[in-house]
Amino acid sequence: MPKVRTKDIIEQFQLELVSGAEGIYRPITTSDLSRPGIEMAGYFAYYPAERLQLLGRTELSFYETLTPEEKRARMQRLCTDITPGIIVSRGLDVPPELIEASERQSVPVMRSTMKTTRLSSRLTNYLESKLAPTTAVHGVLVDVYGVGVLITGKSGVGKSETALELVKRGHRLVADDCVEIRQEDEDTLIGSAPELIEHLLEIRGLGIINMMTLFGAGAVLPHKRISLVIDLELWDPEKQYDRLGLEEEKMKILDIELPRLTIPVRPGRNLAVIVEVAAMNFRLKRMGVNAAEEFSARLSDAIEEGERD
């Protein structure tokens, strides 16, 4: 799992570090946040100390009603050796008892001018993106008519050449050769290129070319949701290929199954056009239009009419 540290949160959201600077390299292992309201009342039985703690106006206004002894006790229990950080929102004053306890336990205390709800939402989205399960797939990812198409297949089958032709036809390259994929949701896979090979495409005989330099910024994308997998394979005359499109193959990446099409490759086939049509047909299916099923229904009706005659 990728590591996120408190220091990354400070830099990403431009937080003010108030105290506990020694702990800014503590790891953040979950995207869940905690607003320790009931803990301020003294109930720590289920205190999620491993989460980022977020203190807003509600928590701090209740905190001000406590006695000095209770204030010190609450903050000492709030700051543990596994707490990645405590953030005070709305630019509110940080209680001196919190500063004292955080320095003792090296728990970073930060302050943000954002409203609590907005800060919570942005933190959650950022952490879910950074802590999402990841994998890498050998292939090419292209944005075709707004559909993220992952082109797979053995080396030399023509994946990069197909991507080059697609870019020339106005589509956008996301990644070539190695596609880093992260699962951001129960049904969402996001693909991107490793930083080392971003915007680069390898063509046998030409070498490595920079697609952004060659075709402009509109020819590339930093990341794209993957919706369709197209597997290119050399034409096997002994194999029966799907000619109707009624049976839908699936490919599982991480915990998500994606629709997959197997396209046989042989000289004379325009793969770029086939990929374009596959992407458009995929969009039509999502809109409820399935040409294969319509043909099958018409064929069944024709057979029934013939039998009656």
From Swiss-Prot:
This is HPr kinase/phosphorylase. Both phosphorylation and phosphorolysis are carried out by the same active site and suggest a common mechanism for both reactions. Residues 264-269 are annotated as: Important for the catalytic mechanism of dephosphorylation. Homohexamer. Its EC number is 2.7.11.-, 2.7.4.-. GO terms for molecular function: ATP binding; magnesium ion binding; phosphorelay sensor kinase activity; protein serine/threonine kinase activity; protein serine/threonine/tyrosine kinase activity. ATP binds at residues 153-160. Belongs to the HPrK/P family. Pfam families: Hpr_kinase_C, Hpr_kinase_N. The keyword Membrane does not apply. Mg(2+) binds at residues 160, 202. It comes from Geobacillus thermodenitrificans (strain NG80-2). Residues 201-210 are annotated as: Important for the catalytic mechanism of both phosphorylation and dephosphorylation. It catalyses: [HPr protein]-L-serine + ATP = [HPr protein]-O-phospho-L-serine + ADP + H(+); [HPr protein]-O-phospho-L-serine + phosphate + H(+) = [HPr protein]-L-serine + diphosphate. InterPro entries: HPr(Ser)_kin/Pase, Hpr_kin/Pase_C, Hpr_kin/Pase_Hpr_N, P-loop_NTPase, Ser_kin/Pase_Hpr-like_N_sf. Its cofactor is Mg(2+). The keyword Nucleotide-binding applies. Keywords: ATP-binding, Carbohydrate metabolism, Kinase, Magnesium, Metal-binding, Multifunctional enzyme, Nucleotide-binding, Serine/threonine-protein kinase, Transferase. The active site is at residues 138, 159, 177, 243. One of its GO terms (biological process) is regulation of carbohydrate metabolic process. The Walker A ATP-binding motif also binds Pi and PPi. Catalyzes the ATP- as well as the pyrophosphate-dependent phosphorylation of a specific serine residue in HPr, a phosphocarrier protein of the phosphoenolpyruvate-dependent sugar phosphotransferase system (PTS). HprK/P also catalyzes the pyrophosphate-producing, inorganic phosphate-dependent dephosphorylation (phosphorolysis) of seryl-phosphorylated HPr (P-Ser-HPr). Signal peptide: none annotated. SUPFAM superfamilies: HprK N-terminal domain-like, PEP carboxykinase-like. It comes from the Bacteria.
